[in-house]
Amino acid sequence: MSRPAHRRPEYHKINKDLFVLTYGALVAQLCKDYEKDEDVNQYLDKMGYGIGTRLVEDFLARSCVGRCHSYSEIIDIIAQVAFKMYLGITPSVTCNNSSKNEFSLILEKNPLVEFVEELPAGRSSLCYCNLLCGIIRGALEMVHLAADVTFLQDRLKGDSVTEIGITFLKKRDEKKYRGKK
């Protein structure tokens, strides 16, 4: 039996607290499995990248955003729509250079660290939320935008805010991706 054509797809929501606690358990297990913080950071980024490449389809289907014409429009959509949709927060945006390809997302509140007081002992270079960087990078790559995404500041490391830096490297050649006429 097939679904009626007019029926909207159902989206399953997971409890935010369950997700945050599960993520914390994942990071704790990775810290046990890997001795070096760099390996944990790389694994979290890789996981996030995989999530981002799939999440972008859901985002585009649910948000109905149009085509963006500048990097600043893209960053505003990420901050005001994507973060709000998936994490329930709206980070502030700053542009970091005159060529307008470097931006920062400043999170006053980071839901992923809601139940975390500090980084584990001896893990000072751990980027606990590196999953977010991978998600953003993966999603941008799926819409043909190469970007470098890193944490610039982290509350878990004593900074006053959490800041994610996004640098657009270059716009990919769109002619390659357009159908031939």
From Swiss-Prot:
Transmembrane segments: none annotated. GO terms for biological process: endoplasmic reticulum to Golgi vesicle-mediated transport; intra-Golgi vesicle-mediated transport. It is found in: Golgi apparatus, cis-Golgi network; Endoplasmic reticulum. Keywords: Endoplasmic reticulum, ER-Golgi transport, Golgi apparatus, Lipoprotein, Palmitate, Transport. A lipid is attached at C68 (S-palmitoyl cysteine). Signal peptide: none annotated. One of its GO terms (cellular component) is TRAPP complex. InterPro entries: Bet3, NO_sig/Golgi_transp_ligand-bd, TRAPP_component. Homodimer. Component of the multisubunit TRAPP (transport protein particle) complex, which includes at least TRAPPC2, TRAPPC2L, TRAPPC3, TRAPPC3L, TRAPPC4, TRAPPC5, TRAPPC8, TRAPPC9, TRAPPC10, TRAPPC11 and TRAPPC12. May play a role in vesicular transport from endoplasmic reticulum to Golgi. This is Trafficking protein particle complex subunit 3-like protein. It comes from Homo sapiens.
